[in-house]
Structures are given as structure tokens and as C-alpha cells.
UniProtKB/Swiss-Prot annotation:
This is Delta-actitoxin-Aeq2b 1. Residues 20-26 form a propeptide. The keyword GTP-binding does not apply. GO terms for cellular component: extracellular region; nematocyst. Binds specifically to voltage-gated sodium channels (Nav), thereby delaying their inactivation during signal transduction. Causes death to crabs. InterPro entries: Myo_ane_neurotoxin_sf.
Amino acid sequence: MNRLMILVFAAVILALASADEDVDIAKRGVPCLCVSDGPRPRGNNLSGIMWMKTGGYGGNGCPKGWHFCGKSRGFFSDCCKR
């Protein structure tokens, strides 16, 4: 079971890292919670997109035209918003 979870996690990371920037960039990736989403009594909106940190992006891990919007930075990824 642990091997299956590791395999699925690795597949998600590879899918996020290979996301093509020019093909509907806002719909790729995993939704994440931005600071501006805030706590709400009926649940939070996930308006950010989780981006993998790669060499082609800025120091914050977000693509051009996007900004970091999360509460804390991840080791492999950041929550970014357009």
C-alpha cells in the first residue's frame, strides 16, 4: 500500500512539473489555499494553483505573470495565483 501511495504521489509531481505553460495554464495543477481565501464558516475557496519549483521559473516557483499567495512555502512547490 505504501508503494502505491508513493507511486501515485510521484506521478502527480511529474504531471505538475511537466505542465505546458501555454495550454490553459490556469486549469493545470492542483488547487491550493491562498491567504486571500481566508477562513470562512462554510468552507474555503481554493483559488491558487500548486506549482512545482523548477529552474525555468523565478525564485518563488511561480511562472511569469503569477505571484506567491500561500501562507508558507513548500519544499518542492508553491501556491501561486495569477
